[in-house]
From Swiss-Prot:
Cofactor note: Binds 1 zinc ion.
Enzyme class, broadest EC rank: hydrolase
Ligand binding (Zn(2+)): H114, H118, H124
Superkingdom of the organism of origin: Bacteria
Organism of origin: Salmonella typhimurium (strain LT2 / SGSC1412 / ATCC 700720)
Keywords tagged on the record: Cytoplasm, Endonuclease, Hydrolase, Metal-binding, Nuclease, Ribosome biogenesis, rRNA processing, Zinc
Gene: ybeY
Protein name: Endoribonuclease YbeY
Organism ancestry: Bacteria, Pseudomonadati, Pseudomonadota, Gammaproteobacteria, Enterobacterales
């Protein structure tokens, strides 16, 4: 049986309207057990200032972003179930959901799925990688009862 341990950190000022720990756990459980049996993931919910600082420091991008993924790399020869950390910016997620006319809960779920896939080694730097990752995200989101997060982009093409 797979086990995903969640460490949820609420580092944003306003906690009203945030998904609860059970929702974050459900979203992680919808992704990670497909790839590995045990994992520990920290999800830290932050405000724009912290997201901006981290995005500038680690990605060279001078703005807040929706989700940042920091995979854990154990020292050679040591096996640990730590998968890594997801930093999710509340304001960016809420703004994107509104701009993209997506249900807020679905967009939160998508950020957890997207970030988890990054922790598992997936990326979207080139077109082939992006296509594979988006396909996995869509499959996982549909399995959890949400719409395809990329449906608007597919319709626009």
């Amino acid at each position: 049986m797979s086990q995903v341990i969640l460490d949820l950190q609420l580092a944003c000022e306003n906690h009203a309207g945030l998904p609860d720990e059970a929702q974050f756990q459900r979203w992680l459980d919808g992704v990670i057990p497909q790839f590995q049996e045990e994992a520990e993931v920290t999800i830290r919910l932050v405000d724009e200032a912290e997201s901006h600082d981290l995005n500038l420091t680690y990605r060279g991008k001078d703005k807040p972003t929706n989700v940042l993924s920091f995979p854990f790399e154990a020292p050679a020869g040591i096996e640990m179930p730590l998968l890594g950390d997801l930093i999710i910016c509340r304001q960016v997620v809420e703004q994107e959901a509104q701009e993209q006319s997506k249900p807020l809960e679905a967009h939160w779920a998508h950020m957890v799925v997207h970030g988890s896939l990054h922790l598992l080694g997936y990326d979207h730097i080139d077109d082939d990688e992006a296509e594979e990752m988006e396909s996995l995200e869509t499959e996982i989101m549909l399995a959890m009862g949400y719409e395809d997060p990329y449906i608007a982009e597919k319709i626009a093409e």
